[in-house]
């Protein structure tokens, strides 16, 4: 890792982190004025970055991971900015698979803090996400990365990341999410996501239906060429012992690739990633077929369709909206149908609880309802009542913490059972930390 700052005025890591977390109270406040001003005061570190910008409802993180891994296999230095984190804040800001160090983080905060405090004095405080975005851009600039993978936080048009002019914009797929903020219709949400499209910058998109028309119209207005990805462009050819093989149709040739990321929908994510790097190739980047194949094979994404334990078999997936839960259920039906399924479910209360519950219950043999430590976590009794209202013959338990839920699941699981932890990334993050702690 590079060292970004060596300054006697650098504050201790914990003080820096506590200061940053104090801004979580501001929540999401849309608009680019604050992040633009903040970055200007910091010398506009984002303007020198070669960015791949990724938006969408589901699959953003996986696509970012695939592209980052491909570029690294080709010998490039790659920054990766993702959100939210699963276990540690440092997961959000990564260069070549190395999370930002405590020293670098504290040094960056020491630089950003005076600017932010001055903005607060003017009643113009940036949000938590805006500050983190500025930290990521600074870190990538200081470390002179060749490319920066930047994942949209929420929406697109007014997201803090939308100050970049990327080499390529990727929109994975679009379904209902954050409807209180983005709108109640897919078309409205698509319009927000399409806000990342820039004049003359190529777009790679996997959206369908109403969203496709909206994105196509915006791209046409901005003279941005679009590569559309649909299900005819990839086929799953095999699944064996946690590995999938896909045949993916690229712009120039077909690719046979393998991935340890689970779920048939990874075919779409891989097709999006390949289409994006093909755009970079058309812009002059040198990549070999092996770079693409080896990069996809090496990519991992903790907490998303992740097998974290073999005995007992435990699957973690941060599905937190109806579309994501449907993908999880399809994977359970297709690849784990011979196993009894013990589901540990913890969801945030501002999600579409009824649809999420009604989607996961049919595949479940036993359901253990719990909650994460996040203050937005739904009350388990509310989820229990929803399951009862479905009038299905399921065994349901309630535990007041994720460690207790995991211990309970392990006690009742049979040798060939699958334990599936899902409902939110906060639930999965706590579960992952606890399971790894036990294993170590």
Q: Predicted segment positions?
A:
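Charged, amphipathic alpha-helical linker segments immediately N-terminal to NTP-binding catalytic cores
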Residues: 1-26
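ATP-dependent carboxylate-amine ligase catalytic core
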Residues: 12, 26, 32, 36-49, ...
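Nucleotide phosphate-binding/pyrophosphate-handling subdomain across enzymes
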Residues: 48, 147-152, 159-170, 174-178, ...
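A conserved segment at the C-terminal end of the G1
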Residues: 54, 62-79
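Beta-strand->loop->alpha-helix junctions that form or flank phosphate-binding loops
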Residues: 82-84, 205-207, 218-240, 259-264, ...
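Extended acidic/charged loop-beta regions that coordinate divalent cations
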Residues: 132-181, 212, 216-256
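Short glycine/serine- and small hydrophobic-enriched flexible loop segments
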Residues: 138-141, 275-282, 433
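C-terminal helical cap/extension that packs against the catalytic core
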Residues: 208-218, 223, 313-316, 322, ...
């Amino acid at each position: 890792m590079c060292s970004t700052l060596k300054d006697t005025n650098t504050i201790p890591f914990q003080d820096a982190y506590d200061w940053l977390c104090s801004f979580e109270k501001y929540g999401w406040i849309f608009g680019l004025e604050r992040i633009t001003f903040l970055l200007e005061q910091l010398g506009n570190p984002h303007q020198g970055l070669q960015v791949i910008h990724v938006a969408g409802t589901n699959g953003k993180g996986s696509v970012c991971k695939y592209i980052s891994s491909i570029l690294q296999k080709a010998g490039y230095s790659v920054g990766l900015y993702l959100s939210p984190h699963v276990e540690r804040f440092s997961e959000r800001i990564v260069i070549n698979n190395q999370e930002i160090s405590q020293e670098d983080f504290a040094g960056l905060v020491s630089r950003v803090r005076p600017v932010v405090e001055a903005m607060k004095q003017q009643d113009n405080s940036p949000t938590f996400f805006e500050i983190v975005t500025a930290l990521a851009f600074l870190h990538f600039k200081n470390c002179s990365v060749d490319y920066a993978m930047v994942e949209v936080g929420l929406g697109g048009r007014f997201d803090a990341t939308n100050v970049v002019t990327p080499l390529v914009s990727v929109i994975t797929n679009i379904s209902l999410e954050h409807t209180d903020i983005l709108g109640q219709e897919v078309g409205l949400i698509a319009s927000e996501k399409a806000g990342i499209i820039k004049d003359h910058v190529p777009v790679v998109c996997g959206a369908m239906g109403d969203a496709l028309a909206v994105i196509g119209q915006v791209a046409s207005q901005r003279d941005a060429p679009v590569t559309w990805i649909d299900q005819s462009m990839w086929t799953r050819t095999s699944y064996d012992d946690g590995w999938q093989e896909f045949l993916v149709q690229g712009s120039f040739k077909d690719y046979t690739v393998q991935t340890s990321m689970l779920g048939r929908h990874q075919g779409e994510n891989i097709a999006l990633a390949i289409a994006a790097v093909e755009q970079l190739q058309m812009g002059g980047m040198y990549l070999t077929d092996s770079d693409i194949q080896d990069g996809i094979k090496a990519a991992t994404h903790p907490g998303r369709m992740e097998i974290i334990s073999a005995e007992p078999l435990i699957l973690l997936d941060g599905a937190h909206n109806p579309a994501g839960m449907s993908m999880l259920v399809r994977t359970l039906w297709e690849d784990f149908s011979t196993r009894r399924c013990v589901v540990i479910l913890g969801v945030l209360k501002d999600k579409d609880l009824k649809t999420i519950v009604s989607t996961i219950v049919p595949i479940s043999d036993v359901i253990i309802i719990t909650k994460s430590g996040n203050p937005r976590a739904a009350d388990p009794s509310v989820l229990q009542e929803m399951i009862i209202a479905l009038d299905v013959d399921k065994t349901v338990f309630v535990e007041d913490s994720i460690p207790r839920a995991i211990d309970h699941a392990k006690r009742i699981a049979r040798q060939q059972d699958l334990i599936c932890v899902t409902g939110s990334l906060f639930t999965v993050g706590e579960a992952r930390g606890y399971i790894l702690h036990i294993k170590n």
